[in-house]
Amino acid sequence: MHIVKIGGSLTYDAKPLLKALKNYAKENNKKIVIIPGGGEFANVVRKIDKALNISNSLSHKLAIKCMDLIGEVYAEIGYIKAYDTLFDLKREIEKEKIAILLPSKILLSTDIAEHSWAITSDSLSLYIGKLLDVREVIIATDVDGIYDKFPGGKLLNIINANDIKGLTSVDETFPILLKQFKMNAYVVNGRHPERVMDILEGKHNIYTKIVGIDKI
């Protein structure tokens, strides 16, 4: 099983990637779970939080629900079914090979993540990966990967989670959880579906692999 988290930054550009993932899953008999980011909906929550100083718990709850909203959008434009429980997802993915997970029910009922803006949908996708016993997560976003500095830096092909320090396209908690869960991740530009397909195939392309173990 593969997990592909499609960030909210790709909301308006996600359709080709969704189509490519759906075709790949069916043609290769591979199971793919898509986890949505919070997108512009989450940005509205941030704005309200900043203006009204609402509690961390409420911000956390609302931001997670935003992932469901983007997930519903991806489900419609990608013609992919969406589910809000692991039971339904696991059952249906055996037939469909691909599904979108609307994660709020799972994440809020288990309350497994810290209530903080330090944890975004990137890190939440790792929690889902742990629940599904998946060892790798693909983070499809609007940048080519992780750079050694920004702006004007060099794209890194591979990096240890221990070495990620600021100015990255993943949240600050992501490398910590990656090490804790002993997982690997790929950061890739989702506007180029062929790059995501190459990760699924184990082929080299333009992306960054983040290794969540002590040594690469």
From Swiss-Prot:
<keyword id="KW-0460">Magnesium</keyword>
<keyword id="KW-0808">Transferase</keyword>
<feature type="binding site">
    <location>
        <begin position="147"/>
        <end position="152"/>
    </location>
    <ligand>
        <name>ATP</name>
    </ligand>
</feature>
<dbReference type="Pfam" id="PF00696">
    <property type="entry name" value="AA_kinase"/>
</dbReference>
<dbReference type="InterPro" id="IPR036393">
    <property type="entry name" value="AceGlu_kinase-like_sf"/>
</dbReference>
<keyword id="KW-0418">Kinase</keyword>
<comment type="subunit">
    <text>Homotrimer.</text>
</comment>
<feature type="binding site">
    <location>
        <begin position="5"/>
        <end position="9"/>
    </location>
    <ligand>
        <name>ATP</name>
    </ligand>
</feature>
<dbReference type="GO" id="GO:0005524">
    <property type="term" value="F:ATP binding"/>
</dbReference>
<keyword id="KW-0067">ATP-binding</keyword>
<comment type="function">
    <text>Catalyzes the formation of 5-(aminomethyl)-3-furanmethanol diphosphate (F1-PP) from 5-(aminomethyl)-3-furanmethanol phosphate (F1-P) and ATP. In vitro, can also act as an adenylate kinase that catalyzes the transfer of a phosphoryl group from ATP to AMP, generating two molecules of ADP.</text>
</comment>
<comment type="pathway">
    <text>Cofactor biosynthesis; methanofuran biosynthesis.</text>
</comment>
<dbReference type="InterPro" id="IPR053666">
    <property type="entry name" value="Furan-3-ylmethyl_P_kinase"/>
</dbReference>
<dbReference type="InterPro" id="IPR001048">
    <property type="entry name" value="Asp/Glu/Uridylate_kinase"/>
</dbReference>
<comment type="similarity">
    <text>Belongs to the MfnE family.</text>
</comment>
<dbReference type="GO" id="GO:0016301">
    <property type="term" value="F:kinase activity"/>
</dbReference>
<protein>
    <recommendedName>
        <fullName>[5-(aminomethyl)furan-3-yl]methyl phosphate kinase</fullName>
        <ecNumber>2.7.4.31</ecNumber>
    </recommendedName>
</protein>
<feature type="binding site">
    <location>
        <position position="142"/>
    </location>
    <ligand>
        <name>ATP</name>
    </ligand>
</feature>
<feature type="binding site">
    <location>
        <position position="39"/>
    </location>
    <ligand>
        <name>ATP</name>
    </ligand>
</feature>
<dbReference type="InterPro" id="IPR011375">
    <property type="entry name" value="MfnE"/>
</dbReference>
<keyword id="KW-0547">Nucleotide-binding</keyword>
<feature type="binding site">
    <location>
        <position position="166"/>
    </location>
    <ligand>
        <name>ATP</name>
    </ligand>
</feature>
